[in-house]
C-alpha cells in the first residue's frame, strides 16, 4: 500500500499534469517514417536515463491509462516493468503476454473485462513484421484461456501502417486457433490501434476510460473499410 501511495503521489504531482504527458508523447510522435528522427535524448531527460526508449513508452502508456481510468486498478501489477527506487522504469519484464494487462470490474459503463495494452515503437517498414503476430497471439490466447469475449486489445504506436490497421480489423471475422489444440478457437477479436497523435488527444481532452470504452466498441462494430475506418471511427471521435 505504501508503494502504491508513493506512486500515486508521483503521478499526481508530476505526471498527471497534462503538459508533461503531452510533451513526452509529442517527443515520441516525431518517430514516424524514419525511426531515427525520434528525440531519444529529450524523452530520457523528461523521464529517466535508466531505461531504453521503448520501455519508457510502455511506462508512459501505463500512466496515461491509469489517469484515463481515474486511478482505479492495480497499475503497478498491470505494468510488466521493473521500477527503480523512484518508481521510474528500468526494464521490461519479458514474458509471453501483453505489455500491460489492465483488469476492469463491471460498472454501469462497461462489463467486466481485461484490456491488453501493447506498446510498440516502429517505423513504417518493420511494424507489420514485428507486431502483427504477437498482438493477435496474446489476445487470442487470453480469450481462449479466460473465455471472456468482452476482453480486447489496444495497440499503441507512434506510426500506424495501413496494413496493420487492415489486419487488425480482419481479426473481427478471422478465427484464431490454439496451435496446441485446434478444437479451441475464437473469432471476433477486438484490436483497436491508436497512434501517439490520438494518445495526445486523450490527454489534452481529458478523456476517461468510461468514455473511451463505448467509442472503441462503436469503432469495432463499424463496417467502414480500413482506409476510412481509423479517421472516421477513432481520430475524429477523440
Describe these PLM feature segments.
Residues 9, 13-238:
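Catalytic core segments in nucleotide and nucleic-acid processing enzymes
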Amino acid at each position: 500500500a505504501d508503494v502504491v501511495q508513493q506512486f500515486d503521489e508521483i503521478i499526481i504531482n508530476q505526471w498527471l499534469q497534462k503538459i508533461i504527458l503531452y510533451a513526452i508523447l509529442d517527443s515520441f510522435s516525431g518517430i514516424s517514417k524514419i525511426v531515427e528522427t525520434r528525440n531519444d535524448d529529450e524523452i530520457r531527460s523528461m523521464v529517466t536515463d535508466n531505461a531504453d526508449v521503448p520501455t519508457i513508452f510502455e511506462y508512459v502508456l501505463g500512466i496515461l491509462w491509469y489517469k484515463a481510468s481515474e486511478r482505479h486498478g492495480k497499475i503497478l501489477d498491470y505494468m510488466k516493468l521493473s521500477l527503480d527506487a523512484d518508481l521510474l522504469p528500468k526494464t521490461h519484464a519479458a514474458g509471453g503476454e501483453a505489455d500491460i494487462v489492465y483488469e476492469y470490474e463491471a460498472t454501469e459503463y462497461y462489463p467486466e473485462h481485461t484490456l491488453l495494452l501493447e506498446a510498440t515503437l516502429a517505423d513504417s517498414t518493420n511494424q507489420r513484421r514485428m507486431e502483427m503476430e504477437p498482438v493477435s497471439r496474446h489476445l487470442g490466447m487470453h480469450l481462449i484461456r479466460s473465455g471472456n469475449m468482452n476482453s480486447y486489445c489496444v495497440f499503441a504506436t507512434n506510426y500506424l501502417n495501413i496494413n496493420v490497421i487492415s489486419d487488425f480489423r480482419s481479426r473481427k471475422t478471422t478465427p484464431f486457433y490454439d496451435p496446441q489444440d485446434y478444437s479451441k478457437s475464437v473469432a471476433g477479436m477486438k484490436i483497436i490501434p491508436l497512434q501517439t497523435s490520438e494518445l495526445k488527444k486523450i490527454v489534452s481532452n481529458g478523456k476517461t476510460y468510461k468514455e473511451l470504452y463505448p467509442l472503441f466498441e462503436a469503432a469495432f462494430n463499424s463496417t467502414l473499410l480500413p482506409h476510412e475506418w481509423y479517421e472516421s471511427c477513432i481520430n475524429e471521435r477523440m
